[in-house]
């Protein structure tokens, strides 16, 4: 079995989800698209997110028969899943903040949701909290800065500690916060730095393993008509810029053969 799985995000944060899935399904055929023309998604309207999602999946599906799409972005997942599921027959898996496991594991029943502004403000997230964390205090930080800091770390290997510290400053003196939900696929890439800044927090929860298990379960239930043999893992971006060659090297380090421009304006 070698299913073709497309993952997409506005940046490279979705690679944390890809990595978790790859560990569960090492032999799958992977395609990854980062929509850098519209990065960061947290600053975009819901209509734009839906439009981009459909365009990206449609364009790649024309060239590569897909078995599954993983929306490897929390912000997009709170908006685009119904539209994608309506349009495409293959399974669509989203990424949502891990509120249920966080509520279960927290000993003080005080949880921090660290996500983008878009995710923090969505009614969908309020519903998840109401459903799974009714007995918890949920503190929220909505940040675009942290997404930018992670992209910078991916490109340069460095993190601006001062800017990072400012993002979570209000939690550094919180007396009872013991669990933090990494509610954006970028954030596990600075988990170590966050642990240093928030030493009282016992649990940092990200959705990677849960999504990997979900993907494996769904694929076992579907007949894979499009199973790929000996196909190369390829990455796509939606805008050519001065970072292209640097990004291609990064994607090759993550196991992708090459980086291609996905031209969404061409019919």
UniProtKB/Swiss-Prot annotation:
Record-annotated disulphide pairs: none
Pfam families from the UniProt entry: Asp_Glu_race
Keyword NADP part of the UniProt annotation: no
Residues that coordinate or bind substrate: 9-10, 41-42, 74-75, 185-186
Highest taxon above the source species: Bacteria
One GO MF term: glutamate racemase activity
Gene3D superfamilies xrefs: 3.40.50.1860
Annotated family: Belongs to the aspartate/glutamate racemases family.
Protein name according to UniProt: Glutamate racemase
Organism: Actinobacillus pleuropneumoniae serotype 7 (strain AP76)
Source taxonomy: Bacteria, Pseudomonadati, Pseudomonadota, Gammaproteobacteria, Pasteurellales
């Amino acid at each position: 079995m070698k299913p073709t799985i497309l993952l997409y995000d506005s940046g490279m944060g979705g690679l944390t989800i890809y990595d978790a899935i790859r560990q569960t399904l090492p032999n799958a055929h992977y395609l990854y698209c980062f929509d850098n023309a519209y990065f960061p998604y947290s600053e975009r309207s819901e209509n734009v997110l839906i439009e981009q999602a459909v365009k990206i999946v449609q364009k790649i599906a024309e060239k590569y028969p897909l078995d599954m799409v993983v929306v490897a972005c929390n912000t997009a997942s709170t908006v685009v899943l119904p539209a994608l599921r309506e349009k495409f027959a293959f399974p669509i898996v989203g990424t949502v903040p891990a509120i249920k496991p966080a509520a279960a594991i927290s000993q003080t029943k005080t949880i921090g949701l660290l996500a983008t502004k878009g995710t923090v403000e969505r009614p969908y997230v309020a519903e998840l909290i109401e459903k799974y964390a009714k007995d918890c205090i949920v503190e929220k930080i909505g940040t675009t800065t942290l997404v930018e800091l992670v992209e910078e770390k991916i490109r340069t290997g460095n993190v601006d500690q001062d800017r990072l510290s400012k993002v979570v400053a209000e939690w550094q003196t919180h007396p009872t916060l013991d669990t933090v939900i990494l509610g954006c696929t970028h954030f596990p890439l600075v988990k170590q730095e966050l642990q240093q800044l928030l030493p009282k927090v016992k649990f940092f929860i990200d959705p990677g393993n849960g999504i990997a298990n979900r993907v494996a379960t769904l694929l076992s239930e579907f007949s894979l008509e499009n199973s790929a043999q000996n196909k190369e893992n390829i990455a796509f971006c939606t805008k050519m810029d001065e970072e292209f060659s640097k990004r291609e090297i990064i994607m090759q380090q993550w196991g992708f053969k090459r980086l291609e421009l996905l031209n969404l304006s061409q019919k």
